[in-house]
Structures are given as structure tokens and as C-alpha cells.
Regions:
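Collagen triple-helix signature
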Residues: 1-248
Length: 249
């Protein structure tokens, strides 16, 4: 996870979460591939900014991205993609008499990692990783204060391609947007992340389901929901397509 910041300046940005590592590949003949690691969470801004004209809160750190799942060889399942890390919370700003203080921005959520492909002959594709939630905005304190805007939700990742026989991996869902911070006027909500397409089947098997979009965060202007994604195609000989993910609200 990224480190928190206790800095009181608006440019005291919290640390970014680290990215997850990629999963290992399956054996040349047989064996399942490894899953990708999850992204670390972004740090949060923990101190209230009291200086500046007007005071502005520090920004939360962005979450790290998930690692990709590994690819299978001849037979075996593809690796699952890692999930993104959550965005950090923005810092508070102002004192009781400060005018027009603004809370810090929430960090953006990390994106999911790609699902790995199934074995070339037989094997299911790995599911794509899920996008993470954006961080909430910080609070503004005092007259005419404004809350910080919420961070964006992370984007889901595509599901892996199936082997000649096998099902495609599900696409990852998008993360929700962060909520706007409090103040005399609330901050705006962050937009939800988009879902990702499901993996395709090839000869025999079902397509993976598409990921749904994340919901927008609450705020003076709510965030927009992310778009859901299409499912993967079914096998050319036998198999059904995946379902389409729902749009976020």
C-alpha cells in the first residue's frame, strides 16, 4: 500500500499503491497458470490543511493496478487477473473561520489485471481482475467551504481466451467512484469505472460474461456510472455467448 501523508500542504500527495505482479505461466504440456497479484491501496491524506488562501486539502494516492494472470500451455486454465487497489482519501482543509476552503481530491482506483488464456487445446480462460473503488474527497471546513471531489473507479480487465475446448473468462467489473467530501457545498462524485469484455470461446465452450460498470459516487454532482461490457462469443461448434454486464448507475 502507498504511505499516508500527514503533510498539511496541498501538494502533499499520499503514496501510490504498488502494482501487482503477473502470474506465472502453466507448463508447456499441462498445468494451470498462476493468478496475478492485487494492486496495493493508495495512501490517504491524514492531516487537515490549515494554511493557504484558501486552504486546500492534500490529494489521496492512486491505487495500484492488478497483475495479469498467466497463460496456460497445451492444457490447463488461464490465471485470474489481480484486482486493482483502492484509491486513498483526500485530506481535510480549513478551520472554523477560513473562507472557501476545499477538501482534497480522492485518489483513483486501480485497474484490474487481464485474465490469462487457457491451454491451446483444452482449458478455460482466466477471469479478468476487478477495478477498485475511487477514494472519497476530503472535507472543507468553514464558511463557503467545498468538499473535495471523489476519485474515479478503476477499470475492469478483459477475461482470457479459452482453448479450443473451454469457456472464456469473465470480464472484470469496474470500480465505484469515490464520494464527494462534505462542506457547505459537497464535492462531486467520481465516475465509475467501465466493465470489461468476457473472453471468447473457440470451438466448444461458452463465452465469458462481460463485467458490469461501477456506480458513480455521491456528491453535489453525482458521478457517472461506468459502462457494462459485452460477453465473449460462444464456440463455433457448440456454446453460448456470455451475457452483457449491466451499466453502473
Amino acid at each position: 500500500a502507498g504511505g499516508n501523508t500527514a503533510g498539511r500542504r496541498a501538494d502533499a500527495i499520499a503514496g501510490t499503491g504498488g502494482d501487482g505482479g503477473n502470474g506465472g505461466n502453466g507448463g508447456l504440456l499441462s498445468g494451470n497458470a498462476g493468478a496475478g497479484g492485487h494492486g496495493g491501496a493508495g495512501g490517504s491524506s491524514t492531516a487537515t490543511t490549515t494554511t493557504g488562501t484558501p486552504p486546500t486539502g492534500a490529494t489521496g494516492g492512486n491505487g495500484g493496478n492488478g497483475g495479469a494472470g498467466g497463460t496456460a500451455g497445451f492444457t490447463g486454465s488461464g490465471g485470474i487477473g489481480g484486482n486493482g487497489g483502492a484509491g486513498g482519501t483526500g485530506g481535510n482543509a480549513g478551520v472554523a473561520l477560513s473562507v472557501g476552503s476545499t477538501g482534497g481530491l480522492g485518489g483513483n482506483g486501480g485497474s484490474g489485471g487481464l485474465g490469462g488464456g487457457g491451454g491451446s487445446l483444452f482449458g478455460n480462460g482466466g477471469a479478468g481482475g476487478v477495478g477498485a473503488t475511487g477514494g472519497n474527497g476530503g472535507s472543507g471546513i468553514g464558511p463557503a467551504s467545498v468538499g473535495g471531489n471523489g476519485g474515479k473507479g478503476g477499470v475492469g480487465a478483459a477475461g482470457g481466451l479459452a482453448g479450443q475446448i473451454g469457456n472464456g473468462g469473465s470480464g472484470g467489473s469496474g470500480g465505484a467512484g469515490g464520494n464527494g467530501g462534505t462542506g457547505d457545498t459537497a464535492g462531486n462524485g467520481g465516475n465509475g469505472g467501465a466493465g470489461a469484455v468476457g473472453g471468447n470461446a473457440q470451438l466448444i465452450g461458452n463465452g465469458g460474461n462481460g463485467g458490469g460498470g461501477g456506480n458513480g459516487g455521491t456528491g453535489a454532482t453525482p458521478g457517472t456510472g461506468g459502462a457494462g461490457a459485452a460477453g465473449g462469443t460462444g464456440g463455433t461448434l457448440f456454446g453460448a455467448p456470455g451475457t452483457t454486464g449491466a451499466d453502473g448507475t
